[in-house]
Amino acid sequence: MQPNREQAMELLTEFTKSDSLIKHGLAVEAAMRAYARKYDEDEERWGVVGLIHDFDYEQNPTWDKHVYAGVEILRQRGWPEDIIHGVAAHASYMNINPKNQMEKTICAVDELTGFITAVALVRPSKNVLDVAASSVRKKMKDKAFARAVNRGDITQGAEELGVDLNEHIDFVIKAMQGIAGELGLDGSAA
């Protein structure tokens, strides 16, 4: 089975009803696709991993079940091991060392997309087009802001990719800007 975006979206929406979790999957997908283009990798595969990485979270929101349940579902449905491993690698508590660029990238963009979303939503415009890397860095210093986001994962992710943190943040912002409307971050909610 070589899953495509349509199959990945079907899986995501089968298990996920929360609009914010679906948008998170879309944001991670956009960042993964952008990095796949940058690294001349398989954009479809990387995008699929980004889109489904949290597909089981709504039904399994605890660290002892999330990802483990998802991996089992993917195996039962015959999904390829590289995609399964990519999904599993994003959860640092599973103690899976990212073994390739795709796995390093999912780890690097997962928390960051959520943080960028939070930064956009507190802006008066609620528009990701108005978010700059400098404003994200400033908010990262405020531990009370989006406290559930692991800032260590964000900085470690950039290091694992061998990318300057500001460049990484800017790159992911640009990827998200490309689908701002789908993410509800185009200012229409302001």
Question: Which residues are covered by each model-predicted region?
Answer:
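Conserved active-site and cofactor/substrate-binding residues in soluble primary-metabolism enzymes
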Residues: P3, Q7, K23-A27, K65, ...
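Acidic/His-rich, divalent-metal-binding segments that scaffold phosphate/diphosphate chemistry
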Residues: M1-T62
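C-terminal binding/interaction regions
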Residues: T16, I116, N127-V128, A133-A189
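Divalent metal-dependent catalytic cores for phosphoryl transfer on phosphate-bearing substrates
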Residues: Y39-K143, T155
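Generic detector of leucine side chains in alpha-helical contexts
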Residues: L11-L12, L21, L26, L51, ...
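Predominant activation on well-ordered alpha-helical scaffold segments within soluble catalytic domains
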Residues: M9, T13, E29, R33, ...
